[in-house]
Amino acid sequence: MKRIVLAVLMLVAFFSCSNDVLQEEVLTRHEDGNKKEVRYYVKNEDGSKNYVRETWYYMEGMKHLDGPIIGGKRNGVFETYYKSGALMSKGTFIDGIREGEAFTYYENGNVKYQGFYVNGKECGIWKFYEENGELDKEVNRDLR
């Protein structure tokens, strides 16, 4: 938890101390030319790029994935979305590795499943739900 707070504080400090303008770099495009994968950056004094955010888009232009980058790696809360714009999943990365509680949702907003990651591995009790919100089952990922 301390690492998450530290990563968020570093990101806030970076943006508050920077006079640079956030710029967009389209890394990949869909076949129709629309943006697919975009990274946002500020330029360092030496002209190099310091990436601070990663966003992916569906072919139709709606956001699919979004989250912060620190030191070239995913750091902080990343979210994925359905084409409708509804939240699909939410989880934290530290130095590019999944860490902490993660949620996946049905398009209606109800939790589909939730669990914990430690050093990129599923651990503990994961809960799976029906689309109506009723608990379906619990699986102990430590016993696999």
Regions found by a protein language model. Give the residues of each.
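Periodic aromatic/glycine/histidine/acidic cluster detector
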Residues: 17-81, 86-94, 98-105, 110-118, ...
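Sec-dependent N-terminal signal peptides
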Residues: 4-14
